[in-house]
Amino acid sequence: MGSIEVAERTTVGLAAKDPSGILTPYTYTLRNTGPDDVYIKIHYCGVCHSDLHQIKNDLGMSNYPMVPGHEVVGEVLEVGSNVTRFKVGEIVGVGLLVGCCKSCRACDSEIEQYCNKKIWSYNDVYTDGKITQGGFAESTVVEQKFVVKIPEGLAPEQVAPLLCAGVTVYSPLSHFGLKTPGLRGGILGLGGVGHMGVKVAKAFGHHVTVISSSDKKKKEALEDLGADSYLVSSDTVGMQEAADSLDYIIDTVPVGHPLEPYLSLLKIDGKLILMGVINTPLQFVTPMVMLGRKSITGSFVGSVKETEEMLEFWKEKGLSSMIEIVTMDYINKAFERLEKNDVRYRFVVDVKGSKFED
């Protein structure tokens, strides 16, 4: 169907107004549905650790007011005249990006997350010159290219964290050829992304070792998530015994930390895959890499194509996210708890079931 002609479309969300990171109601305008756009009523939105970085200006790039949230699941209310992949009433997803140049090597290769002109779903400037706002809001308008199809049968609240955390671990395992059953993988850090790493790696048939700074999460890692073993990084004997045992490590730690203890765990040709957003330099001595032909690499979320592939995989394997559902009136408390790592393992905001007041 074509665009509905309205003078101005507004929506209300929860926005950070300054680096305190406190979210309060904020009304703003949305563009009308263009020919390639999808107008979405938001039902759920996941809470990511990078949202915390953004609302508090930890990376020094925040612009206010800012409506965060980039793990969006909602219902299609309207589609533009050129939209063929989606129809009114469908449940769809939107991840971290809402724009790209569509002409560079990354875009031509369908890995638009590496486009140098990508447009973030919030805290960025869209092609019309307006500031993008995220998923802690009643509704949004997104170009169809960046809208994700969700397989029937997946619960929408379960899907939300997959749109960032889920594809963040799926993408590098797929790209680096680490989907083969029988591989031995390590998951460093057991937070929102880490718990997804355990689930995805186990679904690929890998032997999974969770690596953490203490044994506080040992029981849940082994019993709740199904990890095969658990390593405490300060356990010198245990770390020595595990040397040269892993094909890869997914490093999800979002703060500065030494790399050398974990490089020693890798086999020859093993990969340490960095995923945490860290704004301080990481250090290591080169022989730790050279003497095993090991690689330190990184990966950044995933493309729309990879996300849809991951969702089909998730459905096929019958996996589920471990989430805590909250409403908008709890969001500031949720961020406080997230900052203390007090969540198992991902907050998901029930936007549809929340009340907004401005």
Curated annotation (Swiss-Prot):
Q: Which domain of life is it from?
A: Eukaryota
Q: What is its EC number?
A: 1.1.1.195
UniProt KW keywords: Lignin biosynthesis, Metal-binding, NADP, Oxidoreductase, Zinc
Q: What class of enzyme is it?
A: oxidoreductase
One example GO MF annotation: zinc ion binding
The subunit field of the Swiss-Prot or TrEMBL record says: Homodimer.
Q: Which family does it belong to?
A: Belongs to the zinc-containing alcohol dehydrogenase family.
Protein's name in the database: Cinnamyl alcohol dehydrogenase 1
